[in-house]
């Protein structure tokens, strides 16, 4: 049922009535019978989810006991027995077994080649419908089906094997009338009338899909317990020193937002498994992404970066003006990540925890390899062709051909191969597991989500992440990072050979010897600093502070990249530091007057337009997609209009100079900052 939810929504958007069902093999006492079971209501859809989980964990097979138990428990599904020449001898017996459950919606399904059984079936019931298999809407697409089947089954083909066919084509009522009597065709309309699946207007099963309530000590509520942990964290951080008012106010503000949005349990759950990892001496990363802007996450020990010290903004993580799910990505040693997931699995239970499915889609390189094998193309040519496709054109084979004369030569040599590559690009090829994400729910997942067996006995969702988010599930990102494993091994070796119980937190962030290595570009193997381009920047910049490292990694990406030399010159005193307006100096002084970070964009919008930080982040998010589209279409003048539209007109006059300067600098680069 991988695409069931998305399919339903697309049908409804296009005013088509969705019919949702699944096929399974019923292993009866006499033979194996194929069944199609369809939902007649939302409750029936929920029962389909449960059945899908049963059959997905049992090789797509259900027993007689499974079928009888299932039909006894639900009346809101319709069952179709596939009646064919293989099982016709036992067809009445199988019908009687299903009918004995008292289920009224039992049908026989027929394909044209089995119409000689119609008389026997009519003697049992009048509930008979056509069940032609539909795989494509255009007979020209038959060859795509042939290709995908050959890839799946690892078969070979010749070009002459490819053909047009209407065998699995969508058939109109007139087409069906050529094969079936009217009374059978009319039963289709009856089935359509019986099936009335409608999803709730609100997110379905919101209570079931919510996070588990964290078990707090002393009968405290989640909100109060989180507040108590933050108080303890602040006191531990400042020890005997007085806690600055800015920290107290920031924590209280964040707690208010977290509690009002109902995410206290989320923080407690994340804090719990991070604490488990640290107790087990599993190295935990300092945090990545927008969660670094949360002081609550910092004082809990979830992250290791003080957001106040580094001017990070909480609203980029959790915006009180935008209902969105929090997203905390936590890195663990890659060799011990499974221990953390096992802990979560044991704590919350098998029925409540699952990995997330992903679908690997066919890109150009994969298509060339698959099609090359199917048509038995020389392996040396296949290898050469895939090397000639840049990663940025992996889904745009025509662009890759334009960029490479050698690839164009191969396209001329193998025209069918490249034509078919274009036709199968983007098709799902196989399922995989999300690299980091798991989901945890208060009620059993199977009440709302179809599951299948995943890694090490842990369930895997059949729905991908986008669908889970649409349903309201919160993803927990448990990442495995090789660099943390390397660091842990280094600490163990230091302890073993030098008898030092060294901790990374004890190493000063201004260590001169460390910066001597970095400024010389000796950073091979160091996360985010190891590419040749990055090493050149470190050398030219003469990096001597953590702020320089942060700036260099932020500059080394599309958009800000062209300001690298200006930044270096200003840092080294070779170029005067200027500001587009003196009012913005507090936000740009640390980066020598150059806009590098998203936080700076938000602060500028706050200053220039009078927005709250939450509103400023909304603006950034809302216009980013539009900006990207305009940028792709080279419509720079519209980009300027778009920027001006987000600024209050009454403030335009006061900050006219800022805006003019913003527009003088490469506006596309500025907008790319918003996107990134």
Model-derived features: positions:
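Alpha-helical scaffold/interaction cores of sigma-54-like transcription cofactors
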Residues: 1-676
